[in-house]
């Protein structure tokens, strides 16, 4: 909740550990790996690199992903998925076919596939989230992949997996039934009725093969699609009993409009998107007279600035490799705040992508660069545990062209009863004004500041480079003491602050 105060007043944040929203799903801190550009090849997989392990996986990339505490990784796409035959990526590498990959107009070598992905997930301690092809693929090919991954030996595709050196099932729990099938750009694009019927039948077969799995339905690719939200309504009504999540996607950027105040208020758009989808879920549940629940999976989200997206038929082309500035990091931080504020309906989220492609990690042969956006994700994934809290905020308003008057502070919070710790995450959107803020703690009152971090600067375009890799990075700060359940802190203009109290 929010109320307005005058600009010269001290902002107030009220937190009561008894005013909770929902349990925070660990799967909110997921990532996405697609066969696009250099995400897989030269990203996570680079056997020629001295920085790779014996399996060809980049050790520095995996260390960075472990640092960010990724809980799940979605694979193999993305638009790539809708033209992908999963059989191309299993078995002896010397027999795997080279293909013209149509989604990104690249050459796919298939040297990295399902089993290599499973090994990668184990090494970073993340749960695999597989996707099945609903473009050129069939409901049978979807069921076959589930059998390959999850069935015990004794049938065709489980035995095939065993012959490839993996006798034990991978036991993949989460399965996306297609990707962005509402988009005309998608290979094998279907209309809403065609997709819904195909997805329902695919999910039935997949769950018959492996009854414990959870399935993700393709929702709208973004909130500006002409079929939004009718696509979602039709797909949900048709498939409700067979699906566990509705996928939503969104990207944003400030490179075209160059409207920084509105860009720094992007959480308004993000939150509206979730609210519309939550209402659609409630409607579909009522319409189907069901006791079954379906939640949201925001399994593609990121700042995406303009850049090349066609590979001109080369291997591992440099596609969509754009740097991320301080203002981009503050937008990412707001996205994460929305995840906590909507934890009652949003249970899965996967940032696109984990390295090189529209990513806050970039590789080259001799190292790894972290952009500013790396830090809000890392801090929240490490601090936010337990339940999300319903923060009450009193702060000034800032004027924006797209969203009208917006609170200058964007806030989310968490409370973990097991460790008796509170996490607080604050964005100061102001381009010019620092904000003195009182954090008022109620309930199980914290007494100490265990961690305090800030990412701040005076230039919204400040960006890390290979020459200056720490130009925009989160730094530990000395926070004032908590006195009588209150912590007063100064929030610089253009800043992100993460606190862990205990």
Task: List each language-model region with its residue ranges.
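Active-site His/acidic residue clusters
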Residues: 249-265
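Non-catalytic accessory regions flanking glycosidase/transglycosidase catalytic cores in CAZymes
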Residues: 2-231, 236-245, 267-271, 275-308, ...
């Amino acid at each position: 909740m929010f109320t307005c105060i005058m600009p010269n007043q001290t902002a107030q944040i009220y937190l009561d550990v008894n005013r909770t929203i929902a349990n925070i799903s660990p799967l909110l801190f997921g990532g996405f790996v697609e066969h696009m550009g250099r995400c897989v090849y030269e990203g996570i997989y680079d056997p020629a690199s001295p920085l790779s392990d014996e399996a060809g996986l980049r050790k520095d990339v995996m260390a960075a992903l472990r640092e960010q505490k990724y809980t799940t990784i979605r694979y193999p796409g993305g638009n790539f998925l809708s033209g992908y035959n999963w059989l191309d990526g299993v078995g002896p590498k010397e027999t795997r076919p080279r293909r013209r990959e149509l989604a990104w107009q690249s050459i796919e070598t298939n040297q990295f596939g399902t089993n290599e992905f499973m090994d990668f997930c184990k090494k970073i301690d993340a749960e695999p989230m597989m996707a099945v092809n609903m473009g050129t693929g069939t409901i049978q090919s979807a069921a076959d992949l589930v059998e390959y991954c999850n069935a015990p030996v004794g049938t065709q595709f489980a035995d095939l997996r065993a012959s490839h050196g993996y006798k034990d099932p991978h036991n993949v729990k989460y399965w996306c039934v297609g990707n962005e099938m509402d988009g005309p750009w998608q290979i094998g694009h279907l209309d809403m009725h065609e997709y819904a019927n195909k997805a329902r039948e695919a999910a039935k077969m997949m769950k018959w093969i492996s009854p414990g799995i959870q399935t993700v339905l393709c929702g709208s690719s973004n909130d500006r699609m002409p079929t939004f939200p009718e696509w979602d309504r039709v797909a949900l009504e048709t498939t409700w009993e067979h699906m566990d999540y509705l996928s939503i996607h969104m990207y944003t950027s400030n490179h075209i409009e160059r409207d920084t105040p509105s860009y720094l208020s992007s959480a308004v758009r993000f939150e509206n998107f979730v609210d519309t989808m939550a209402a659609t879920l409630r409607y579909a549940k009522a319409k189907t007279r069901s006791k079954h629940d379906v939640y949201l999976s925001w399994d593609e989200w990121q700042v995406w600035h303009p850049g090349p997206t066609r590979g001109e038929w080369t291997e591992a082309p440099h596609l969509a490799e754009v740097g991320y500035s301080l203002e981009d990091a503050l937008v990412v931080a707001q996205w994460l705040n929305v995840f906590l504020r909507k934890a009652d309906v949003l249970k899965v989220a996967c940032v696109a992508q984990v390295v090189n492609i529209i990513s806050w990690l970039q590789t080259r042969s001799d190292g790894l660069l972290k952009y500013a956006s790396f830090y809000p994700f890392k801090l929240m994934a490490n601090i936010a545990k337990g339940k999300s809290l319903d923060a009450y905020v009193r702060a000034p308003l800032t004027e924006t062209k797209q969203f009208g008057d917006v609170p200058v502070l964007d806030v989310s919070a968490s409370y973990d009863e097991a460790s008796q710790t509170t996490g607080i995450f604050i964005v100061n959107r102001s381009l010019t004004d620092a904000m003195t803020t009182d954090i008022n703690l109620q309930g199980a009152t914290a007494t100490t500041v265990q961690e305090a971090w800030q990412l701040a600067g005076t230039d919204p375009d400040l960006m890390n480079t290979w020459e200056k890799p720490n130009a925009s990075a989160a730094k530990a700060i000395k926070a004032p003491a908590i006195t009588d359940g209150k912590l007063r802190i100064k929030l610089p203009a253009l800043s992100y602050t993460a606190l862990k109290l205990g």
